[in-house]
Amino acid sequence: MFSSCWLKSSVRYSRLIRQFSSENSFFKVELVPSDRKTPLQPRKVVAPRFEKKTRQKISDYLKQMATPEIEAKLAPLRAAVKEYGDLIRDLKAKGAPKIDIDKAVVELKARKRLLEDTEIALAPKEASFDRLKLEDLLKRRFFYDQSFAIYGGVTGLYDFGPMGCSLKANMLQEWRKHFILEEGMLEVDCTSLTPEPVLKASGHVDRFADWMVKDMKNGECFRADHLIKNSIEKLLNDKKTSAAVKQDGQDVLARLEGFDNKDMHEVITRFNFKSPITGNDLTEPIAFNLMFPTQIGPTGDFKAFLRPETAQGIFVNFKRLLEFNQGKLPFAAAQIGLGFRNEISPRQGLIRVREFTMCEIEHFVDPEDKSLAKFAKVADQKLVLFSACNQLDGAPAQEVAIGEAVAKKTVANETLGYYMARCHQFLMKVGIDGRRLRFRQHLSNEMAHYAQDCWDAEILTSYGWIECVGNADRACYDLQQHYKATNVKLVAEKKLPEPVDVNFVEAQANMALLGKSFKKDAKKIQTSLQQLTSEQVSALEEELLAKKLYNLSVDGQNYALTPEHLNIKKYTKKIHVQEITPSVIEPSYGIGRIMYALLEHSFRQREGDEQRTFLAFKPLVAPIKCSVLPISANDTLIPVMDAVKEELSRFEMSYKVDDSSGTIGRRYARTDEIGIPFGITVDFDSLKTTPFTVTIRHAETMSQIRLEVSELGRLISDLVAGRQQWSDAQAKYPKFEASATE
């Protein structure tokens, strides 16, 4: 019986091997840029021999982070390994002959080896990404560093150096062009100090919190969900952990986003998790509000907070913005500014910080019509969507056209889908690797009760999938909350096809009697009565008639009203417009997180020289567009240098002159390291013709061309703006072969 089963299974497995070989899963021919003056050479790539720990790291990475294409290739191999693992257990349980078990073990080992080799061959470079080398580069070249470092530093606060500051500024400039200018948005710049009543109305005072646990002996604090995640991942990587415990841990990780304090306490207790620093017991999770409190003015009575998001400044200015837009919907407002969150335990560099730059859009739209004319322009654009259904079913993310996703109601509406597509375009434009970008839908227990749909743009880094952009349909919640708190209507008018007669019922307060009965609370009661809908007033009237008493709840306090406290007014009015509270579609961008992901995705190592690292930014966002390098300090080159600088300045191209005494190769390496995409070399051949000529070197490929200085500014400008690619320049201008190795 075993022999027959083994034979059939082996035949199927042989087909798998032939399939993967034919698809070049293991053997590829690629052209590798040489570091020396040698042409590109074909090189056979095979799965390298990694040590066991590294192979396991790659396998674990692919189980969590594989793209749909990679997962489709690995799934049958994993199933083949599982098949023989189950078969061996079954043979042992039935007391099968040792020779049959040994045959099965040999086959299982072969299948495991094929799976491991395939994982290594298919694994993207980031699976074995060396974060320490990137961090060394960023710190050494001062892209950013911990704030107040000479005083010991403060976790969660960072200062950007010249390169980091310029990179960030270029990203923000491109964001402003991509959204505010192209979409005709209204830009505002609101204060970071926010009075407590504003954030009380928005819900931040009561609900903007994370669950925190403390070391019971020394009081050290940890964010509960992060502690659980890190502890479970440690268990999963421990060979001594049983299969049942690993499965339990994986189930917890899949549901962790929706856990409350009770769920987290149950997990910490069940797995017996301790403090990762001391091993001490932990307290039960408690809520920790993430806002920084402060006071406005000298008395300390005016409570305020540093804003946790920029959105509230737009909401409270809605009436002014609507007026500026001639009262028309839809329209979008945008703001670029700082947000502040008092994180419990900031980790992972720029990914989790206490002060950060946000770019937020609030798109106000008719809640009954969220269609968008411009959606047709992006309907065919494909995005990798990780829907809530796929998450719950354990299925991988899928590449889907956004038009199809909206048509099937996977994405709630056209406006939300449009901003997701535009988000994808922006991230690709600044240099995010499209293979490491997906949109994950919030599960129902993750979303706020008022939200209708939410998709996070997540970028894959060495820390895992990181939420960098939130795209949410917030419905009418925020404007309604601020109306309730201020009694200022935040509505738009929608013209009706034909005038209609509408019956109104209002509760008018008897302020004289309310003042006698309720003193200072009379005004608050009057405001609450004014905010009642016609249906609520009718219910109030019925209760007053039946019981001669009505309990009105305001801010959690009840007030007993009698018929004498108010008058019920009924009337009919012909209306030509309908007042509506707009829904809000909100894309929210965390610039620091996108910037860190970009740094990882742009990090490179020279082939054959792993110590020679550099950053390959897209010219559009590169901190400095080109370097200017004289081949020597000879004074005869000065006129050419001056002409080059004048030409670059004419086209507003940033440049860095490096006229130090090092070799040209060493200077190339220095400028490559900080992400300068183009190097302009002034050599003695530059003087041989009139007008002067120079060479331009492309940092990533190290190829060079020669052209006249008069053409330099236009070419660099076109390369930066994307009007030309480097391949276009190579086709137009003569190739330059360096006379010395770099």
Curated annotation (Swiss-Prot):
Major localization listed first in the record, in broad terms: cytoplasm
Keyword vocabulary terms for this entry: Aminoacyl-tRNA synthetase, ATP-binding, Cell projection, Cytoplasm, Ligase, Nucleotide-binding, Protein biosynthesis, Secreted, Transferase
InterPro entries per the UniProt record, alphabetical: aa-tRNA-synt_IIb (IPR002314), aa-tRNA-synth_II (IPR006195), aa-tRNA-synth_II/BPL/LPL (IPR045864), Anticodon-bd (IPR004154), Anticodon-bd_dom_sf (IPR036621), Gly-tRNA_synthase/POLG2 (IPR027031), GlyRS-like_core (IPR033731), tRNA-synt_gly (IPR002315)
Binding site for ATP: R341, N342, E343, R352, V353, E467, C468, R593
Catalytic activity, as annotated: tRNA(Gly) + glycine + ATP = glycyl-tRNA(Gly) + AMP + diphosphate; 2 ATP + H(+) = P(1),P(4)-bis(5'-adenosyl) tetraphosphate + diphosphate
Protein's cellular compartments: Cytoplasm; Cell projection, Axon; Secreted; Secreted, Extracellular exosome
CDD domains xref list: GlyRS-like_core, GlyRS_anticodon, GlyRS_RNA
UniProt family annotation: Belongs to the class-II aminoacyl-tRNA synthetase family.
Its biological purpose: Catalyzes the ATP-dependent ligation of glycine to the 3'-end of its cognate tRNA, via the formation of an aminoacyl-adenylate intermediate (Gly-AMP). Also produces diadenosine tetraphosphate (Ap4A), a universal pleiotropic signaling molecule needed for cell regulation pathways, by direct condensation of 2 ATPs. Thereby, may play a special role in Ap4A homeostasis.
Protein name: Glycine--tRNA ligase
Annotated organism of origin: Caenorhabditis elegans
